Amino acid sequence: MGILALVTDAVSLPIDYDMPPLLEACRTVGITAEVCDWEDGTVDWSRFEAVVFRSPWTWAERQAEFLAFCERVSHVTRLITPMPLVRWALDKRYLADLAAHGVPVIPTTVVAPGSDALAAVRDFLAARPEAREFVVKPTDGCYSKDVQRYQRSLAEPASRHVARLLANGSHVILQPYVESVDRHGETDLTFFDGVYSHAIHKGAMLMPDGTVHVPTLDFRQARDADEDQRAVAAAALAASVAHLGLDLPLVCGRVDLVRGADGSPMVLEMELCEPSLNLTFSEDGALRFAQALAERLKP
C-alpha cells in the first residue's frame, strides 16, 4: 500500500479537528499518510498512491486556482474524490439537482452574475410571502463565509450584499430562514461508503442581529440521527452518486439537515469534497473512515 496524501492548507489545519484522530486511525489500519498543503508548490504529488481532500478550505477564496490544482494532481495520482464530484460539490447549486431527484431541500433561488440584485431579492420575497427572514449566501463558500441572515424588511441592505457577491463572480443563493434552527439547530450526519456512521447537533450560526458564529467545537455536540433523518441523508448521497454517474458510493460525506415547518427533515447543505466529519464526536468514526480509505487503496 502506497502513501496517502491528506490535503489541507496552513490556514485551515489548526481548525481541522478531524486530522489528529484520522492520522492515528490510518496508522491503526496500516495506511502511511502524510499531511500536505495544497498551496505548497514544492510537493511532488506523483509520489502518492492517492490523495484525499481533508481541509483545503482556502479554496473558497481561490476556487479557480484550487480546481486547476485538482486537475493537475489528477493527472499524476488518484483522487479519492473524483473531479466531477469536486466541481459539483463545491457549488451549492447542487441543491437544485438534489431537488430534481426528489430529495427534500430548503427552497432555494439562485441569482446569477449580471442579475439586478435588488430586483432578484424583491422577486424572491414576493414569491415567499411567508418568509419573515431570509438568508443570502454565495454558492461557492464554506465555513459560513459571506453568509448573512436578514429580516424581510431589509431587502435593500440584502441586495447590496447580493450585488457584492455577484460582482466577485459568485452565483448567490436566496433561501427563507428556517425558524426551527433557532430552537433545534441542525443535525449533521456523517457517512462512509454510503453507510451512516454518526451525527452531531450544531447550534444556530446566524443570529437575528446579523452576527455569524464560526462553527467551532463549542457549537457542536454528539446527537444520534433518527430514522427519518438517516433516510433523507442517505437519499441525498444516493442522488449525488446517480446524478454524477459514479460507480462507487462516496468514500465520505456529510449531510446537514434542518426541520421544516411540518417537522420533517430537509437538506440544508452537503459537504462531499473536503468535509469536516466531526470525528472527535464519535468513538469509532475515525477508524471507520480509515477503513473506508484502506479499501480504496487496495490494488
From Swiss-Prot:
Which cofactor does the UniProt annotation name?
Mg(2+)
Swapping residue 142 to A leads to an effect described as: About 80% activity on D-OUS, 40% on D-homocysteine and beta-aminooxy-D-alanine
Which InterPro entries does this UniProt record tie to the protein? ATP-grasp (IPR011761), ATP_grasp_subdomain_1 (IPR013815), DcsG_Biosynth_Enzyme (IPR053191)
Q: Which UniProt keywords apply?
A: Antibiotic biosynthesis, ATP-binding, Ligase, Magnesium, Manganese, Metal-binding, Nucleotide-binding
**Impact of altering residue 254 to A?**
Nearly complete loss of activity on all substrates
Where Mg(2+) 2 is bound, by residue?
A: 269
Broad enzyme group: ligase
Q: Name one GO biological process term.
A: antibiotic biosynthetic process
Q: What is the effect of changing residue 215 to A?
A: About 5% activity on D-OUS and beta-aminooxy-D-alanine, nearly complete loss of activity on D-homocysteine
pH dependence, entry free text: Optimum pH is 8.0.
Has the keyword Transcription regulation been applied to this entry?
no
Q: Which residues form the signal peptide?
A: none
Q: What is its EC number?
A: 6.3.3.5
Assembly behavior:
Monomer.
Q: What is this protein called?
A: Cycloserine biosynthesis protein DcsG
